Amino acid sequence: MSKFFIEADYENSIIELFQNDLGYEYVYGPDIERDFYCPLYEDVLLESLYRLNRGLPDDAIQEALYKLKTFENGELVQKNAIFMDYLQNGIPVRFFVGGKEHSTIVYLVDYKNFENNSFIVANQWTFIENSNKRPDIIL
């Protein structure tokens, strides 16, 4: 038995932990057809936004997705605070129905019924932001 723990072993151990102990679905990043300039798993995210926010119009869901993809202002700490607020409290959006403006919250997580959420662990998820980035694990 080797005394060395290589990176792939570590990565696989983490994936197994999330799959077997926590019930996450596993996806291998290179197998997913997507926009490499966006770090989000947009297909699953969009489906989840519609599922968790039934009855909201497309414009509300699309604005929430836009806000998730474009909060560029501020330093990393500020961006993390904004994202954490979105996770905990939802994303405030405005939309029009019949020429009248409405506002609501689009939720990213169902805290009351966890089975309504998607839990996915991915590895080798490459995205491009100034250069190629490939975190070992993304949740």
Which residues fall in each region the model found?
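An alpha-helical interface "stripe"
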Residues: 1-139
